[in-house]
């Protein structure tokens, strides 16, 4: 089944995207830097909009723009964002983490995936930063 996904910056255009046939909304903030984690208030309102239209919602977990190599402090912030988002009803996340040599950061990904629990997880554009030979292994 083909799913049309719309990447929404905050609440802007979610209604129009759904009306145009989007089957899933990827919610983020700061698209100019590739997307960052939106506020809890924005997430709550997006949940209301998507639930009433029976459209899936995925929330990006990314503490900042730039690369996908995160400090321990940033990882802790990501874990806190996942926990908080789950508490208000998020069941699908978009995330990813790499090492400084552009490999999948296994340690960080294990922490993030464990925090997500049973939630659906989509690996974001960090995947494109992996060497082609590493992409298959990462899957």
Language-model-derived ranges and their functions:
Residues 2-8, 25-27, 55-61, 93-95, ...:
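Hydrophobic faces of well-ordered beta-strands that scaffold small-molecule active sites
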Residues 11-16, 31-56, 72-76, 97-117, ...:
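Active-site-adjacent beta->alpha loops and helix N-cap segments on the catalytic face
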Residues 21-22, 29-32:
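Short, flexible N-terminal segments of the mature chain
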Residues 64, 128:
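Active-site beta-alpha loop architecture of Rossmann-like, nucleotide-cofactor-dependent enzymes
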Residues 67-68:
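Surface-exposed binding patches on compact interaction domains or structured appendages
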Residues 81, 90-94:
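Hydrophobic alpha-helical segments and helix pairs
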């Amino acid at each position: 089944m083909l799913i049309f996904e719309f990447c929404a910056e905050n609440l802007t255009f979610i209604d129009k995207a759904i009306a145009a046939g989007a089957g899933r909304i990827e919610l983020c903030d700061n698209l100019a830097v590739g997307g960052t984690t939106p506020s809890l208030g924005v997430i709550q309102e997006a949940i209301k909009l998507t639930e009433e239209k029976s459209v899936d919602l995925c929330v990006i977990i990314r503490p900042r723009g730039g690369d996908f190599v995160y400090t321990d402090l940033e990882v802790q912030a990501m874990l806190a964002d996942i926990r908080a988002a789950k508490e208000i009803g998020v069941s699908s996340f978009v995330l990813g983490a790499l090492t400084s040599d552009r490999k999948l950061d296994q340690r960080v990904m294990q922490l993030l995936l464990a925090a997500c629990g049973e939630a659906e997880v989509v690996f974001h554009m960090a995947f494109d930063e992996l060497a082609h030979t590493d992409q298959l292994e990462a899957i």
